[in-house]
């Protein structure tokens, strides 16, 4: 990489750190081009990205964005995976790493919290934000449905009693 290209590359990484609330740092040594392309396509379908980075440039970008604590994660052949949806991205990367031994999860950042590889694997087991919203809506609707059921049962019970009383007399 030419010296004149390095500031542009640092700026690209800075933009990724600023615009993506979640970034996973990986080592990709031994992955074939087709495997990397496959991972990129999967990530792109979920509005995420995969970028191979030079460690020194990634460290400079981390320092510029106040993420000094992750600079020690940049060693070896490093790539970052980034997205606005941390759970879905973590799930994709963990599944890919499980099926491809050459992709190693090193750590990451989610909403300015530093995570180790174990935490990212645990994050991948959580339901997505969309799934959580659906569960909350279901929980909020359940009491209203039960109240309607009780009210309907009461009115139909009263109607049966009145009908039975009318038949008797």
From Swiss-Prot:
One MF term in the entry's GO annotations: large ribosomal subunit rRNA binding
GO biological process: translation
Protein keywords: Ribonucleoprotein, Ribosomal protein, RNA-binding, rRNA-binding
Any Gene Ontology CC annotation: large ribosomal subunit
Statement: the UniProt record of this protein carries the keyword RNA-binding: yes
Family annotation (InterPro entries): Ribosomal_uL10, Ribosomal_uL10-like_sf, Ribosomal_uL10_bac, Ribosomal_uL10_bac_type, Ribosomal_uL10_CS_bac
One Pfam family from the record: Ribosomal_L10
Keyword Ribosomal protein in annotation: yes
Assembly and oligomerization: Part of the ribosomal stalk of the 50S ribosomal subunit. The N-terminus interacts with L11 and the large rRNA to form the base of the stalk. The C-terminus forms an elongated spine to which L12 dimers bind in a sequential fashion forming a multimeric L10(L12)X complex.
Its job: Forms part of the ribosomal stalk, playing a central role in the interaction of the ribosome with GTP-bound translation factors.
Stated family: Belongs to the universal ribosomal protein uL10 family.
UniProt protein name: Large ribosomal subunit protein uL10
Phylogenetic placement of the source organism: Bacteria, Pseudomonadati, Pseudomonadota, Alphaproteobacteria, Rickettsiales
Gene: rplJ
């Amino acid at each position: 990489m030419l010296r004149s290209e390095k500031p542009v590359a640092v700026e690209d990484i800075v933009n990724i750190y600023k615009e993506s609330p979640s970034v996973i740092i990986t080592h990709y040594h031994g992955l074939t081009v087709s495997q990397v392309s496959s991972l990129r396509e999967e990530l792109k379908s979920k509005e995420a990205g995969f970028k191979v980075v030079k460690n020194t440039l990634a460290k400079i970008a981390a320092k510029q964005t106040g993420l000094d604590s992750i600079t020690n994660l940049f060693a070896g052949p490093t790539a970052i995976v980034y997205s606005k949806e941390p759970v879905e991205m973590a799930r994709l990367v963990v599944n890919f790493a499980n099926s491809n031994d050459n992709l190693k999860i090193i750590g990451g950042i989610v909403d300015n919290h530093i995570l180790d590889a174990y935490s990212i694997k645990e994050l991948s087991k959580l339901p997505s934000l969309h799934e959580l919203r659906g569960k909350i809506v279901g929980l909020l609707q359940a009491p209203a449905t039960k109240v309607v059921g009780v009210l309907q049962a009461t009115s139909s019970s009263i109607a049966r009693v009145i009908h039975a009383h009318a038949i008797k007399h």
